[in-house]
Every structure is written in structure tokens, then in C-alpha cells.
């Protein structure tokens, strides 16, 4: 998934040039980004979708120092790129770690984790390849109050459940069911850009 580079948005604003984001796969009209749009006020410059995702959940690991290091050093050793990470602490000194990878790595990661079961000492592994990541992108996202709320409102209004959330200075990403990804992009687009 490709989006507008922040610098292109800055240059368009500086020289009063309207931008239009279009798909290279369809002839559908794109999204116009211009001065005075609602998106500008909320620091959002684009919406992106990535369907090449899988969610890995390692369930009931020991909740001890170094557990996350063991998991992610193992992934690094096998050149597995990690995106969103979520750790949740359960009961009885156990925790679960979930993370996203490229869908094409799912089978390989399943094998890596199976081979490392004794070392990692987990109860189970679940890999879901029917997920997608949808992101809003823009400058200063982390310090823009209300942007995440508006994104989540759009998804809730469309009946879309959020599986994982990740934020950074330039984007807010959610992991959702793949079947909802197109509907999610439209709902988020309508929320920030209008019709």
C-alpha cells in the first residue's frame, strides 16, 4: 500500500497545488486533498490499506524478563519483518504476545515457532491470515487530539471490529478482518474527507 509522502503534501500546500490520490489499478476517481479540506485540519493526508498481513498470537508465555526478547530475536534471526506488536498480561504469571507479519511469511513463522516451542515455553500459537491493516497517515498524528477517535468512530459506524492498534508520529494503523478492509477504507475516507 502506497500513500502520499508527507513532503509532497507540504510542497503542494506551499505552492497552492491541489493533490489527487488515485488507484493505479482502477479508473475510479481519486481523493482530492486541497487547502481548507477537513483532512488538513486533522493533519491526515491519506488512507492506506495493506492486505498482505497475518496476525501471530503466541499464547500463555511465561511473564518473565527476556520473554519478548526471545520471541523477537528469534524472528530477527530468521529475517521476519514485524509490524504491529501487542503484549497482554494474563493470570498466573503468563502473557500473550501478538504481532503482525507479511502474509507470505505465515507458514514459515508457524514452523519457526513450532521448532522453538520448548525454548519459548508457550501453550499455543494462532496465526490468522485473513486480516488487513488500514492506516491513516499524516504529519503530527501523535500530537493531534481526536484523530484516532474519529478513525475508530468511522470503523464502529461501519460495524468493523478492531483487532490491534498501532500509533506513531506519522500514522495510526488498525488490524481488522480482511473482508472488511475495503469497507473500512471507504468509511475512514468518508469520515475525514467527506463524500
Please report, for each region that a protein language model flagged, where it lies by residue.
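C-terminal catalytic "cap/lid" subdomain
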Residues: 1-195
Amino acid at each position: 500500500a502506497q500513500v502520499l509522502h508527507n513532503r509532497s503534501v507540504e510542497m503542494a500546500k506551499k505552492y497552492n497545488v491541489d493533490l489527487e490520490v488515485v488507484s493505479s489499478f482502477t479508473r475510479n476517481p481519486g481523493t482530492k486533498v486541497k487547502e481548507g479540506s477537513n483532512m488538513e485540519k486533522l493533519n491526515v493526508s491519506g488512507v492506506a490499506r495493506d492486505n498482505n498481513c497475518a496476525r501471530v498470537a503466541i499464547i500463555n508465555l511465561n511473564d518473565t524478563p527476556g520473554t519478548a526478547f526471545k520471541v523477537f530475536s528469534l524472528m530477527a534471526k530468521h529475517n521476519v519483518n514485524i509490524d504491529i506488536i501487542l503484549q497482554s498480561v494474563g493470570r498466573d504469571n503468563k502473557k500473550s504476545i501478538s504481532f503482525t507479519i507479511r502474509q507470505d511469511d505465515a507458514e514459515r513463522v508457524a514452523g519457526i515457532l513450532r521448532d522453538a516451542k520448548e525454548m519459548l515455553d508457550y501453550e499455543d500459537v494462532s496465526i490468522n491470515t485473513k486480516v488487513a491493516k488500514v492506516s491513516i497517515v499524516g504529519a503530527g498524528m501523535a500530537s493531534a487530539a481526536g484523530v484516532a477517535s474519529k478513525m475508530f468512530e468511522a470503523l464502529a459506524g461501519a460495524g468493523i471490529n478492531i483487532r490491534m492498534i498501532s500509533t506513531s508520529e506519522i500514522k495510526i494503523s488498525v488490524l481488522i478482518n480482511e473482508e472488511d478492509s475495503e469497507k473500512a477504507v471507504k468509511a475512514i475516507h468518508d469520515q475525514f474527507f467527506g463524500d
